[in-house]
Amino acid sequence: MSYTVVALGGNALLRGGEGSIQDQRDTIEQTVPHFVDLYERGHELVFTHGNGPQVGQLLLQNEEAESAAEKPLDVLGAESQAQIGYLLQQQLREELGETPATVITQTIVDEDDPAFDDPTKRIGPFYDEDEASEKDFPVKEGTDGDGNVGYRRVVPSPKPVDIVEAEHIKTLVETGKPVISSGGGGVPVVEDGDSLTGVAAVIDKDRAAQSLATDIGADEFLVLTDVDAVYRNFGTEDEEELSELTTEEAADMLAAGEFGEGSMAPKVEACIEFVESGGDRAIITKPETATEALDGAAGTTVVPADE
């Protein structure tokens, strides 16, 4: 029995379109068949996923629904986990012939994490300067996909400390059922005595997926994104595909600024942490080459430094 945590990138849930439920269904229908071979080979699968566009839509609905009570960000995060989990459950059941389970996941963070003093994670819709000046939350200037300048809400992005439901997730995996969990990095919560309190923050989904993978004792950590592998000098004439990296080599490349801070860097960091915490290997690739990557024929595999 091999436990494999599969971290789905945003492109595995939504590609183009307007972000409607049907758009998400269409994308998920294209993504899920790539995992049939893994399941049939005996991999016990735990899926994690992002939730950026979905939470963005919920935040916009929050603002436009003037007659309804506003919902806090932690509740919207939980709602998005249920929404995406439902869509994945339906397609996984159809493709795998097995009924999966979605676990609404909470991720403990440290209330003294420095990220709370420096919110940097942009979420939600864009505002013009006048709209931004009226908001009661911090905003930062940025550009949208078309290069237009605007302002977006920013929230802290603290590091995950512990996955509250990890034990329950492992129990489900041991039954042979696919599990969907830690959506959007999980709902960030802080400990308050014996209680947990949700906070307005967003946890990096890859770091949270790694934390879960380590907590449940996963053998493999499969990080899926929109490129087929990790590259040296990515996007240049000298780019070089890397089929294998030791944790030491990957850490050196991170320190040299080889990877984009908002894209590949957190994925590589998560892979290093997983392997250094006892995992067998971590792999970065795209959904279409997931099986080949586990066979060593595609993607980038991160292995212990002494191998």
Swiss-Prot record:
Family annotation (Pfam families): AA_kinase
Signal peptide feature range: none
GO molecular function per UniProt: ATP binding; carbamate kinase activity
Broad EC category: transferase
Localization per Swiss-Prot or TrEMBL: Cytoplasm
GO BP: any one term: arginine deiminase pathway
Keyword S-adenosyl-L-methionine: no
Domain of life: Archaea
Pathway, per record: Metabolic intermediate metabolism; carbamoyl phosphate degradation; CO(2) and NH(3) from carbamoyl phosphate: step 1/1
Record EC number: 2.7.2.2
InterPro entries in the record: AceGlu_kinase-like_sf (IPR036393), Asp/Glu/Uridylate_kinase (IPR001048), Carb_kinase (IPR003964)
Gene3D superfamilies recorded: Acetylglutamate kinase-like
Protein family according to the UniProt entry: Belongs to the carbamate kinase family.
Protein name: Carbamate kinase
